[in-house]
């Protein structure tokens, strides 16, 4: 196990609460599922790493746009990464803009949608996705349940933009066998005020699905608003998720990532009682690795060669071997030291230099 030796920044009080949640859950490491065949959902749908997974996808930030120690503006998310498990060389799907990355996370392909973020079934690439298999097909064939929550979506399975709801951030309506299936559409729901519907469902194992997806609106996900707004939003939401009945009493995990970056890695963090604490890996992951992890966890067939060949992220869970590779982003000089240097110009030079050094290091490693 590779432990991180860096200083924990930001909201220590919130982190202490989350660590307490992990201890209260009383969990040990993950256990094998015990069966290689299709699973039928009972009281618990046992997985290798977790039995319940909540995925939250944020918007349009490189890793060091988030982490405060390399130029970012999100102290809460920085503290969360320091306390739990971060993949700091996660390269999303190496494509822009948003839509193809959301499709990678749910369909195992960008379907040729580089440069496109239009409506479902609106051009050649979205038609390819429309006719493709997807993660919901795999989950249901494995006897698992799922539900997707969209902040500010007007109604179930809504397939057009509306206010701060962007349909391109709701990948599930891009697949024909979901969007035209009434029972499946009933599982793509508005998240309610402050993600209230999601939190209510996490209040019991009878209402929580095995696979839960949450897309915040275009302000809270940092797409249209400052990073500080999204960070504050997450500082309220994440502790509520971790303090829910499902997270306190079952083998549940939370995965937070960003849909895309701009030539640099994105934030990808695992949180929960079954996740290694103060852990980091610089192994090369992508959005396909998220699918590979879900498939490995529940013994599901891959959707495409992309997720089939992608490394899963099992190393972030207790009892699983580390890939043994760590290359942390460089830390700028401590703030106390910077403040001691006379003249605002010197401060600007030092801070700017630290950020440029980080960026140059990233370029040289690509």
Predicted regions and their residues:
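Secretory targeting signatures
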Residues: 1-45, 324-366
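N-terminal pro-sequences and low-complexity stem/linker regions of secreted or lumenal proteins
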Residues: 31-325
């Amino acid at each position: 196990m590779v432990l991180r030796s860096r200083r924990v920044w930001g909201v220590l009080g919130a982190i202490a609460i989350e660590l307490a949640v992990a201890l209260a859950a009383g969990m040990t490491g993950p256990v094998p599922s015990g069966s290689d065949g299709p699973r039928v959902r009972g009281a618990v749908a046992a997985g290798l790493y977790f039995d319940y997974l909540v995925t939250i996808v944020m918007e349009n930030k490189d890793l060091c746009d988030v982490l405060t120690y390399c130029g970012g503006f999100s102290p809460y998310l920085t503290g969360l990464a320091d306390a739990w498990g971060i993949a700091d060389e996660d390269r999303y799907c190496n494509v822009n803009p948003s839509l193809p990355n959301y499709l990678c996370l749910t369909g195992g392909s960008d379907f040729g949608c580089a440069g496109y973020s239009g409506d479902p079934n609106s051009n050649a690439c979205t038609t390819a996705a429309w006719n493709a298999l997807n993660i919901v097909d795999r989950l249901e064939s494995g006897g698992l349940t799922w539900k997707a929550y969209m902040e500010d979506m007007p109604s179930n399975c809504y397939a057009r933009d509306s206010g701060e709801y962007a349909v391109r951030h709701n990948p599930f309506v891009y697949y024909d066998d979901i969007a035209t299936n009434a029972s499946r559409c009933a599982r793509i729901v508005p998240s309610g005020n402050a993600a209230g519907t999601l939190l209510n469902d996490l209040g019991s194992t009878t209402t929580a699905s095995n696979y839960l997806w949450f897309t915040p609106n275009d302000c809270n996900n940092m797409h249209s608003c400052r990073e500080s707004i999204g960070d504050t939003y997450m500082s309220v939401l994440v502790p509520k998720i971790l303090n829910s009945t499902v997270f306190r009493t079952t083998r549940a995990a939370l995965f937070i990532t960003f849909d895309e970056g701009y030539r640099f890695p994105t934030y990808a963090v695992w949180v929960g009682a079954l996740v290694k604490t103060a852990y980091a890996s610089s192994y090369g992951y992508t959005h396909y690795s998220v699918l590979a992890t879900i498939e490995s966890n529940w013994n599901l067939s891959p959707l495409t060669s992309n997720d089939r060949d992608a490394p899963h992220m099992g190393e972030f869970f207790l009892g699983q071997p580390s890939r043994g590779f760590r290359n942390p982003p460089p830390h700028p000089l401590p703030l106390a030291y910077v403040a001691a240097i006379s003249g605002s110009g010197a401060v600007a030079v030092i801070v700017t230099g630290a950020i440029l050094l980080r960026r140059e290091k990233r370029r040289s490693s690509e």
